[in-house]
Amino acid sequence: MTDAAVSFAKDFLAGGVAAAISKTAVAPIERVKLLLQVQHASKQITADKQYKGIIDCVVRIPKEQGVLSFWRGNLANVIRHFPTQALNFAFKDKYKQIFLGGVDKRTQFWRYFAGNLASGGAAGATSLCFVYPLDFARTRLAADVGKAGAEREFRGLGDCLVKIYKSDGIKGLYQGFNVSVQGIIIYRAAYFGIYDTAKGMLPDPKNTHIVISWMIAQTVTAVAGLTSYPFDTVRRRMMMQSGRKGTDIMYTGTLDCWRKIARDEGGKAFFKGAWSNVLRGMGGAFALVLYDEIKKYT
């Protein structure tokens, strides 16, 4: 193997392992966030059974579905995030070579910043093309509030993918893809762009204390997450449409979804579950720092 191939493989492995660990740790928070986001578009959750907020959701899930249901859909999330994060981190460096070749970060700050934004956004959008059906399945499995057996909409990852494919074809597995690309570019641009720019401005980036790295990463993930959150809410709502027919279809398209959420639920609805998303972001920040630490020893 060439040095470039070895470097790419190390990036792939380090990013994937870091993501798998952090996502499993924050899976319960992720499920609460998803339920709050999509409950208005769920056929299983009637108006009188909707969750009132994070605490209500955390208390009711183990009572109604069992403690292990906090990790419902987590396998799909880990499978999805191994290639997603690994491809993001790996492609990020490849895109950086394209957008930042020959740029001096000290004398060309704004050119350096723009290059980081572009490389982060392009990396996120590229990886999303490959793993979107897994992202879709993860959302639908987490939104499934049936206790067991016949009450469940899907038996697992494979069952979810097969049922939606039979019902709606490949289009059903990519429902909400366009708004996802918009959101992922905004999120990744901030996630990688600001993080790398901030680290690049430190006196000695290679030997930055892990606490400083974590603080930078935590701020970046919180800001990036809130900025792109409305896009995430719309895409999750669109994902809930797949498999529906006739009058069960709530939104005719992405623009209709934006309009109806704003009209029927108000602007705050776009940010339902956002606080749990900030908490979940601690896992994302941890993954970013863990990736840097793993690379020091590889």
UniProtKB/Swiss-Prot annotation:
The modification N6,N6,N6-trimethyllysine is found at residue 52. Solcar repeats lie at residues 6-98, 111-201, 212-297. The modification N6-malonyllysine is found at residues 23, 92, 96, 147. The modification N6-acetyllysine is found at residues 105, 147, 163, 166, 268. It is found in: Mitochondrion inner membrane; Membrane. It catalyses: ADP(in) + ATP(out) = ADP(out) + ATP(in); H(+)(in) = H(+)(out). The matrix-open state (m-state) is inhibited by the membrane-permeable bongkrekic acid (BKA). The cytoplasmic-open state (c-state) is inhibited by the membrane-impermeable toxic inhibitor carboxyatractyloside (CATR). Proton transporter activity is inhibited by ADP:ATP antiporter activity. Gene3D superfamilies: Mitochondrial carrier domain. This is ADP/ATP translocase 2. The gene is SLC25A5.
